[in-house]
C-alpha cells in the first residue's frame, strides 16, 4: 500500500543527469523527449520483446541494437546514441541501476515441463521491477493480463495471423496438460476483455528470447478484446503533431498501434477520428480505397471489391473466425497505405531546398530530415539507388557552411556514396570547436586584429613624420642656398689687371687712356648736377 511501481524508463528519467553523463562518456548526445519516444513507441515495434516501460535485460538490448545498426534502409541511425547509452547503463550499471539488472537465468531444461509456471507478482509489461516484499496479511493482486508468450503479428506479410483455431477438439495430450493444471485456475475473461490476440505453441525459449509481449490471449485460445482507453487516445493526440503538420510521425505512430494492438474496424475508426481531422480522415480513406487491388494484382475500380476489402460502413467481421481475421489484416494494410499516400504533399522542391543543417545538429539527424522532406514534398524515394546522387548533392549543399566547404573539397567526390559523405561529415562535426574554444579563438583573433591595427597606425605616423621632415629639410636647403647666392653676388669685384694691361680692351702693352680701340671723339659737356638750395 502506498508504494509506487518504478520502471526502468521512469528510473532513467529520474536520474537524467546520470544518463546524460553516460551518453557524454560514449561521445553521443541524447534528448529526453526522443529517449521516451524510442523506448515506449519505437523499440516495442521491433518484435524482440522490448517492453514499453524499458528494460535493462542485456539480451533484449543487444537484439534492439542489432535492429538499430542494421545496414541499408532497415537501420535507424538516429537511434544509435540512445541504444548505445542504454547498453552502457546495463553493462556498466550505476548504483541506481544495479537493483534492476538481474543475473542471467539458468539454461532451460531439455524437455518442456507439463506443469505451468506460477504467475509472476510483477507487472506483465516489464519483468525488471524492483523486488517488493508484500506484507503478511496483504492479498495478492490479480493479474490484469494473463501471461503469454505469443509472437507479434507482422501486418506487412500475407501470412494468416497466428490465432489458434478453437474449433477442433483438444487432443489427448491437451487433456493431459489440462489435467495437470491447477484445479483452482480461473477461466479466461470474456472475449471483450483483451485486444485481438492468438497464441501458438512454441518450444521452450532460451535466455536470449524475450516473452514480454504487450498483447496476449487466454489459456484456452479464445480471442480477447480490450477497447482503447481514453488516456491512451488523449496521450497519442497531445504528444504528437497533427497529420497536416508532420504526416510521417503520425503515420509511424498509427502503424505501431496497428502492429501492437491489432484493432478492429471500430477501433480503427475511433483511432482515426481522434488523431485526424474530418478532412484528413476522408483523404486517408479515399487513398486507402484507391490502394485496393483486384485478382490481377492491379488497383481495381470495381465497387464491390473495394467495399469488400475496405468498407466505409461497419462490416460483419467476426475476429474469432479465420475469415474475419484475414479481413482485418487486409483492412489494416490498406489503412497504412492510405496514410502514407495521403501524407504526400504536392511536389515542391523549394521545401526540400529549405531544409538546412542546424548549428548543433548532427549530420545523421540532418540527413533524416532531408530524406523526410524528399518523401513528403517529392514523388521520389530517397532510399532508391537512382536518387542517391540527388540526395548526396542536397546533403552537401545544405549542410552547415563549414561542413559543406570541406565536403566539396574531398578528393574523388563523384565516387563517394551517401554513406561515405555522412561519415566524413560526422568526422568534421565531431572535430568542431566547443563554444568555449570558439569564444577564446574569437577573443584571440580580436586581440591580434587590434594589435595589427595599432602597428599599422604607428607605421603610418612614422611615415608621415618622415615625409614632413624630408619636406622641411628641402625647404631649409632652398633657403640656405638662396642666401648664399645673394651673399656671393653682393661681394662681387672687378677682375684685377696687370700693370701693363688695358682696362678697356684687356690687352697688354698700353693703358686705357692710350687704348686705340677707345673712341677719341670730343666729349660732350657733362650734365651739371643741380643742387637744391635750402630755399627751394
From Swiss-Prot:
Motif range (LYPX(n)L motif): 128-132
**Which residues carry the site feature described as Cleavage?**
129-130, 213-214, 476-477
Mod. after translation: RNA-binding phosphoprotein p12 is phosphorylated on serine residues.
Question: Lipid (N-myristoyl glycine) attached at which positions?
Answer: 2
Q: Which residues cross the membrane?
A: none
Bias-annotated ranges (Pro residues): 112-121, 159-170
UniProt feature coiled coil, ranges: 436-476
Q: Where are the zinc fingers (CCHC-type)?
A: 500-517
Top-level division of the source organism's lineage: Viruses
Q: What ranges does the record give for the region Interaction with host PIAS4, renumbered to this chain?
A: 343-391
Q: What is this protein called?
A: Gag polyprotein
Amino acid at each position: 500500500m502506498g508504494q509506487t511501481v518504478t520502471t526502468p524508463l521512469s528510473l532513467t528519467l529520474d536520474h537524467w543527469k546520470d544518463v546524460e553523463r553516460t551518453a557524454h562518456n560514449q561521445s553521443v548526445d541524447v534528448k529526453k523527449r526522443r529517449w521516451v519516444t524510442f523506448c515506449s513507441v519505437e523499440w516495442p515495434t521491433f518484435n524482440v520483446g522490448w517492453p514499453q516501460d524499458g528494460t535493462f535485460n542485456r539480451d533484449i538490448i543487444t537484439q534492439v541494437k542489432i535492429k538499430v545498426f542494421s545496414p541499408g534502409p532497415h537501420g535507424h541511425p538516429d537511434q544509435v546514441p540512445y541504444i548505445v547509452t542504454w547498453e552502457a547503463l546495463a553493462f556498466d550499471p550505476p548504483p541506481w541501476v544495479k537493483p534492476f539488472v538481474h543475473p542471467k537465468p539458468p539454461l532451460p531444461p531439455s524437455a518442456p515441463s507439463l506443469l505451468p509456471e506460477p504467475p509472476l507478482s510483477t507487472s506483465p509489461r516489464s519483468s525488471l521491477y524492483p523486488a517488493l516484499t508484500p506484507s503478511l496479511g496483504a492479498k495478492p493482486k490479480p493479474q490484469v493480463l494473463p501471461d503469454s508468450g505469443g509472437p507479434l503479428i507482422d501486418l506487412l506479410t500475407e501470412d494468416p495471423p497466428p490465432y489458434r483455431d478453437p474449433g477442433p477438439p483438444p487432443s489427448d495430450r491437451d487433456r493431459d496438460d489440462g489435467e495437470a493444471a491447477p484445479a483452482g485456475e480461473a477461466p479466461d475473461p470474456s472475449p471483450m476483455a483483451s485486444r485481438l490476440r492468438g497464441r501458438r505453441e512454441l518450444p521452450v525459449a532460451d535466455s536470449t528470447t524475450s516473452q514480454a509481449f504487450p498483447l496476449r490471449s487466454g489459456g484456452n485460445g479464445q480471442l480477447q478484446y480490450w477497447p482503447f482507453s481514453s488516456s491512451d487516445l488523449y496521450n497519442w493526440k497531445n504528444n504528437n503533431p497533427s497529420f497536416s503538420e508532420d504526416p510521417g510521425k503520425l503515420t509511424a505512430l498509427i502503424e505501431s498501434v496497428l502492429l501492437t494492438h491489432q484493432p478492429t474496424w471500430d477501433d480503427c475508426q475511433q483511432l482515426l477520428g481522434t488523431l485526424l481531422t474530418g478532412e484528413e480522415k476522408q483523404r486517408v480513406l479515399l487513398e486507402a480505397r484507391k490502394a485496393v487491388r483486384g485478382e490481377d494484382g492491379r488497383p481495381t475500380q470495381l465497387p464491390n471489391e473495394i467495399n469488400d476489402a475496405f468498407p466505409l460502413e461497419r462490416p460483419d467481421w467476426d475476429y474469432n473466425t479465420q475469415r474475419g481475421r484475414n479481413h482485418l489484416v487486409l483492412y489494416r494494410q490498406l489503412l497504412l497505405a492510405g496514410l502514407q499516400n495521403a501524407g504526400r504533399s504536392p511536389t515542391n522542391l523549394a521545401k526540400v531546398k529549405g531544409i538546412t543543417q542546424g548549428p548543433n545538429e548532427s549530420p545523421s539527424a540532418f540527413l533524416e530530415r532531408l530524406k523526410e522532406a524528399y518523401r513528403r514534398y517529392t514523388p521520389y524515394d530517397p532510399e532508391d539507388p537512382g536518387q542517391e546522387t540527388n540526395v548526396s548533392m542536397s546533403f552537401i549543399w545544405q549542410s552547415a557552411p563549414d561542413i559543406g566547404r570541406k565536403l566539396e573539397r574531398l578528393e574523388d567526390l563523384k565516387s563517394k556514396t551517401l554513406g561515405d559523405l555522412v561519415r566524413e561529415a560526422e568526422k568534421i562535426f565531431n572535430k568542431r570547436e566547443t563554444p568555449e574554444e570558439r569564444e577564446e579563438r574569437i577573443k584571440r583573433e580580436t586581440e591580434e586584429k587590434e594589435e595589427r591595427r595599432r602597428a599599422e597606425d604607428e607605421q603610418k605616423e612614422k611615415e608621415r613624420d618622415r615625409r614632413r621632415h624630408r619636406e622641411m629639410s628641402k625647404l631649409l636647403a632652398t633657403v640656405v642656398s638662396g642666401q648664399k647666392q645673394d651673399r656671393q653676388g653682393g661681394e662681387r669685384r672687378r677682375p684685377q689687371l696687370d700693370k701693363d694691361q688695358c682696362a678697356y680692351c684687356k690687352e697688354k702693352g698700353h693703358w686705357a687712356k692710350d687704348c686705340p680701340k677707345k673712341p677719341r671723339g670730343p666729349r660732350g659737356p657733362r650734365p651739371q648736377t643741380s643742387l637744391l638750395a635750402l630755399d627751394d
